[in-house]
Amino acid sequence: MTRPGPSDPEDLPPSWAGMAPMNAVHHRSTGYSDRYWRAESLAAKRRGGQRWGIPSAAAVLALNLAGFLALPWMIDTDSSPAYVLAIMIPSVLAASLAFVITARRGNGPAVDFGLPATLSEWGAQLRSGIAWGAAALAGGLLIAVLVLARTDLEDRSPLGNLIGIPLPWKVALVGWIWIGAPFCEEVMFRGMLWGALERRTAPMRMSWLGNRWVVLVVTAVVFALWHREGWRFLVLVWGGFAIGIARMRTGSVVASTTAHSVNNTLPALAILSLAE
């Protein structure tokens, strides 16, 4: 005799549903937003089929780092096209590897990276990304002013080595900094690294790494260190934190990519103002 009830495991209620409530998070009436619950449900959905973790995330980051270290020795970066391509290629390769890993050993990019499935989800994620991107940009400008006021630097601009690039390549670089780099970096940091840490739950060793706030802080710090720009470290940590909030609230790299793009708006536009 077949027991009545849903046969699809995804339709079953949470394991704690039949128990007395132990804390407020078990209730949708506690004031958490719909985006919060969607992020929670996406995280739970990912864990079932996710067979990649910290080693896979480390491989993606290692490929990115190896590309940035090796390409200057392999191509002539004094050439404008080669220089621009040298900036793009390592991140494109790393993001491509991330997509391969999620397709072969995970649930696929749509689930593992929380890609929106409906227009309403797209809208919600874009709105969250714009809001937190604006916070990242405003806070970053304030921190930069405070840091530069107390720091004696000969070259305070990370764009100084871009002077002399012809306009067509500047436009290509603007598009990369504004859209391409945010997408690739979010796949690496708030996609792979975030997902690898997020799946560490009890009884796994070092399950504390799966705490959402630990994940947020770790990804923000690694993101800042990865850019290797000393005086901008605090600016980048704040940016990573604000961008990560967009990821945490929505469960999607679309929101964090949008926030990252908003945060990169001024640097992208600044490139066009550089003398040829």
What do the predicted segments below correspond to?
Residues 1-125, 141, 145, 179, ...:
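N-terminal, membrane-interfacial amphipathic/helix-forming hydrophobic leader that caps
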Residues 13, 19, 25, 29, ...:
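Intrinsically disordered regions, especially transient/low-confidence alpha-helical propensity segments
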Residues 49-57, 80-88, 121-129, 169-174, ...:
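Residue-level signature of transmembrane alpha-helical entry/exit and packing/kink sites
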Residues 57, 61, 65, 88, ...:
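Alpha-helical transmembrane spans of integral membrane proteins, capturing the lipid-embedded, hydrophobic core
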Residues 75-86, 110-181, 199, 203-204:
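Juxtamembrane helix-loop-helix connectors linking adjacent transmembrane helices
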Residues 100-103, 111-112, 119, 134, ...:
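Basic, gly/Ser/Thr/Pro-rich low-complexity segments located predominantly at protein N termini
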Residues 165-276:
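Transmembrane helix-loop-helix hairpins at the membrane interface
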